[in-house]
Amino acid sequence: MAKQDSVQLMTKGSIAKQIIGYAIPIFIGYLFQQLYNTVDALIVGNFLGQNALAAVTSVGSLIFLFVGFFNGFATGASVIIANAIGAQDEDRTKKAVYTTATFGIILGLIMTVSGYVLTDQMLMWMGSPQEVFGLSSTYLKIYFLGGFSLVLYNMLVGIIRAGGDAKHPLYYLIVSSILNVILDVVFITVFKMGVAGAAWATIISEFASMFLCAVQLAREESILHISWLHLTLDFENLKQICIYGLPTGLQGCVIDFANVMIQSYINSFGAAAIAGIGAYSKVEGFIFLPEISFSMALTTFVSQNEGAGQKERSRKGILFGLAASLLMIECMGVLIFLFAPTFISFFNQNLEVIEIGVARAKICAFFYILLGFSHVVSSVLRGLGRPVMPMVVMLVCWCAVRVVVLMIVGQSIHSLYLTHWLYPITWGLSSIVYVFDLRKYKLFTPRV
């Protein structure tokens, strides 16, 4: 079996070319991932009906609650590894790589066990409607059985991307996406497995992508090589991964906690509301792709260049990535605004479902630039070694404000429009805080 060296330094060469070259494979990869999530919802909604669609889409916030927390450690590990690579510290890099892989196995087992055991309790806490409770429970329990693969996959991708390689994860996502769609069709339309079929299709495809990442790292000839029979855990590196990863994980966790609360509120409006918001969330996922791609590119770019002491190059990269990301996400927002009814109708033909989804689109579409700004800046701060600031901002603006407003205003105003407006308002609050924080960083002043 051929060996390979996929490490690519981002400390020299064209800044724009490197950031775009790194971001494009991530964008395409997440596009495929979003497409298979969308196809999953399309198949469920059209073949299994409104309740099945509501069951699958309504648990998305719970899944993100778990995945967002554990992904924080993958981001933290990626920052540590990228910084060590930029500093050309081979010993520190190797220890961080092995610690990340070993820790990923541990975290994967934790997610699988805790998610499976807590499924029904979490659904009751969310106030899942009786007509979708059983379907949601079935889907979630099967999904969490594959949680190990998902967490380990994200940790391994963090290692690969820290070395500047975004292409191989793209290939694995494409394979996983195609496999997921094929299995969806077979399990749901041929074997009549219902929502269980959708869940099994997802976890099998996630295992495939995790396995491909593991094989790549075993074949590496670079400092990213992993010998899977000789895994070790370096506690100093584990400490650093937790220092960087825990704030990021908590950031994702608190955001998703707020989203779970909002989903609980939405659940009180019945299956049509759940399906309408759920369908739009699938459409909305495409809007996030540009800022996710550039955010991840900037985290690695900044980490490597800060590790190499190239602060001015880091600053220029931040400015370019921020401008490109905001331009793209707002273009996507305009597109969604214009064609929301068509996009929503792909998932369900029920007029009430379409109307609810379109209402969310019309309110949020022109505010996505604020969301993009907040996400990109938080990723930059993590790359700069400041993961606590984004956590605090998101905890206050995206969690506390949303939950408090929902608990106070939601008691007197029982309207879905409250949930529609909560998002752009809190995106604006976080953007204001980040503007003041960037002034201290002197983003528009050359650094030496």
Where are the regions that the model predicts?
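Residue-level signal for short hydrophobic patches within transmembrane helices
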Residues: K12, A16-L35, V39, L62-F69, ...
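Short alpha-helical transmembrane segments in multi-pass integral membrane proteins
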Residues: M1-A23, I81-F148, V190-L246, V302-F367, ...
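Small-residue-rich hydrophobic transmembrane alpha-helices
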Residues: L53-V113, L150-P169, G276-A340, L371-M394
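Transmembrane helical elements of multi-pass membrane transporters/channels
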Residues: G21-D40, I142, Y153, S176, ...
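Hydrophobic transmembrane alpha-helices of multi-pass small-molecule transporters
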Residues: L65-G68, N180-D184, M210-A214, F286-L289, ...
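Small-residue hotspots at the loop-to-helix junctions and early N-terminal turns
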Residues: Q50-S61, L140, A199, A271-F286, ...
